[in-house]
From Swiss-Prot:
Key words, A-Z: Ribonucleoprotein, Ribosomal protein
InterPro entries from the UniProt entry: Ribosomal_bL34, Ribosomal_bL34_CS
Family, similarity comment: Belongs to the bacterial ribosomal protein bL34 family.
Protein name: Large ribosomal subunit protein bL34
Organism: Frankia casuarinae (strain DSM 45818 / CECT 9043 / HFP020203 / CcI3)
Gene Ontology MF term list: structural constituent of ribosome
Any Pfam family the entry gives: Ribosomal_L34
One GO term describing the cellular component: ribonucleoprotein complex
GN (gene name): rpmH
HAMAP family: Ribosomal_bL34
């Protein structure tokens, strides 16, 4: 039986997919603006 690969961890989640990380790069800011344009209630982790 193989182990489950998803081990939830909020700090790691925020550090890899968080808002601050998205704001750091131009591409990240593009992602946020696209999500704003689409009308997402949550922009990032």
């Amino acid at each position: 039986m193989s182990k489950r690969t998803f081990q939830p961890n909020n700090r790691r989640r925020a550090r890899t997919h968080g808002f601050r990380l998205r704001m750091r790069t131009r591409a990240g800011r593009a992602i946020l603006s696209a999500r704003r344009r689409k009308g997402r209630s949550e922009l990032s982790a």
